[in-house]
Amino acid sequence: MILNQRKEIALSLLDTFKDAGNVALELRKKGLKKEIKSDNTPVTNGDIEVNHILTKKISTLTPEIPIISEETSSNKKNENLNNFWLIDPIDGTSSYINNKDEFTINAALIINKKPVLGVINAPDKKRLFYSYAPSNSFEIVNNQEINLINQKKKNINLITAVSYSNELKPDILKLHKEFKVNKYQKMKSSLKFCVIAAGEFDLYIAEPRAYEWDI
């Protein structure tokens, strides 16, 4: 898949991600319906509806490429697939349920087992990010594209984002010391990767334990 094709797909998804974000916020406002999945993690009608919106659009854009989603896949690894979409309709479901502002809506296109395109929407923060190549990563601000490759952190302090569960674990603190981290901030969801891309943070440190849609 050539660069222009990836760009066209990414741009075609932006309005869908905005719509999905609005739906997620509206469903939360009305009151979410919650269940506990077999892996003991929560899922809401917001997760299901956002998943439906994304998979419907993506299936239209690339009907030949299979989709792996947190809300429709088993916990088995999909090691035999070379080309596929990864969807995490709502990353940070606990934040979403508890009216916190860190949940995100996510999709990535994997070609030859490597990510080549991604879109992330943080609806509460009104931040929308997308990328279709290493030097083509953007945030939409006031309907204008900001190329994140040009964004630099304004201070020299090394700042890291950590997940809530890893905050004070000895191996994480050891890495902080090794990298001479000046400050860290607890953060949920894929928002961690977005703020690094935007030049606001430097590192994300976590234990190597994740499903496909968490990476």
Question: In which residue ranges do the predicted regions lie?
Answer:
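N-terminal subdomain of lithium-sensitive/metallo-dependent phosphomonoesterases centered on the IMPase/IPPase/PAP
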Residues: 1-90, 174
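DPxDG-like acidic metal-binding loop motif
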Residues: 79-138
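Residue-level signal for inorganic ion chemistry
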Residues: 24, 47, 58, 93, ...
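An extended, acidic
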Residues: 150-215
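Generic detector of well-ordered alpha-helical packing
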Residues: 48, 71, 89-92, 123, ...
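Short secondary-structure junctions
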Residues: 32-35, 137-139, 179-185
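Residues that form or immediately flank small-molecule/cofactor binding pockets and catalytic motifs
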Residues: 29, 39, 72, 142, ...
